[in-house]
Design a protein with these regions (language model features):
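Non-catalytic cap/lid and distal C-terminal segments of serine-dependent acyl enzymes
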Residues: 1-211
Length: 211
C-alpha cells in the first residue's frame, strides 16, 4: 500500500468457542468500523483480530486462570512486534487499544492490566470477569486509582439488559475504588452479538482521542 501515514491499532478479541473470524463473520465489525470512520465518529485505525486459543470448552483440565492464557505471550511477544514491523502503525502505548467480548473481555483485563506500559485504552463487552479481588488483583492497580486513571485514557464496560454476567456490579465496585470506567447498557439484548456490536460501536469513537 502506498502512503506514509501511520495508524493506531485496536486489538479486538472474540469469545469462548469462537476464533479470529468471529468479529468479522458474525460481529460485522468491518461495517461498524467503516461507518464510524466515514461519519467522523472514530479516527482511522487498524483492527487486529487473532485467535485467543479459547475454542475448546472451558473446564477440560484448565483452571479459570489458565484458560486462554497461552494467547498472552503470543500477543505480546509475537503479534504486536509483527504488526509494528510489517504495517504502517504507530508503535507506542498511546496508540494501542485492546477490547474483547465475554472471555475475550477477561483476556483484555489480564493483558492490559498487567502491561500498562503497552496499552492506554481498553474496553469489554459482556466480560467474563468473576470474583476479582479489586484491592489486590493485577498488581493492585485498582487500589491506585490515580495511577490507573492517568495511564488508561478510556475504559469502558458494556453488557445487555437480559444477561447476568455481573458487569454492572463490577463497574460499581471499580467506581467505588475511584476508577474511571464508563458503563454502557444494550437495551433488550442478552449474551449475543447484537449486544457486542452495539458495544463496539459505542467504544470506538472514544479511543485514540486525548481529552
Amino acid at each position: 500500500e502506498k502512503g506514509k501515514k501511520k495508524y493506531p491499532v485496536l486489538y479486538l478479541q472474540h469469545g469462548m468457542g469462537e476464533d479470529e473470524t468471529g468479529w468479522s463473520k458474525q460481529g460485522h465489525m468491518q461495517h461498524i468500523m467503516d461507518n464510524a470512520i466515514h461519519e467522523g465518529r472514530a479516527v482511522p485505525m487498524i483492527v487486529v483480530m487473532e485467535s485467543g486459543d479459547i475454542r475448546a470448552p472451558f473446564g477440560r483440565g484448565m483452571s479459570h486462570a489458565d484458560y486462554g492464557a497461552s494467547f498472552y505471550p503470543v500477543l505480546l511477544n509475537d503479534l504486536i512486534p509483527y504488526i509494528e514491523a510489517n504495517f504502517r502503525v504507530k508503535a507506542d502505548r498511546e496508540n494501542r487499544a485492546m477490547a474483547g467480548l465475554s472471555w475475550g473481555g477477561k483476556q483484555t483485563f489480564d493483558i492490559v492490566l498487567n502491561n500498562l506500559d503497552k496499552f492506554a485504552w481498553m474496553g469489554t463487552f459482556s466480560a467474563a470477569i468473576f470474583g476479582v479481588d479489586v484491592k489486590n488483583a493485577y498488581n493492585g492497580i485498582f487500589s491506585r486509582p490515580d495511577e490507573f486513571n492517568e495511564k488508561i485514557h478510556y475504559f469502558s464496560m458494556s453488557c445487555g439488559t437480559e444477561e447476568n454476567f455481573g458487569t454492572e456490579r463490577m463497574v460499581n465496585t471499580l467506581r467505588e475504588a475511584g476508577i474511571n470506567v464508563e458503563f454502557k447498557i444494550s437495551e433488550g439484548t442478552a449474551h449475543e452479538w447484537l449486544t457486542w456490536r452495539r458495544g463496539l460501536n459505542e467504544f470506538i469513537p472514544n479511543i485514540f482521542k486525548k481529552k
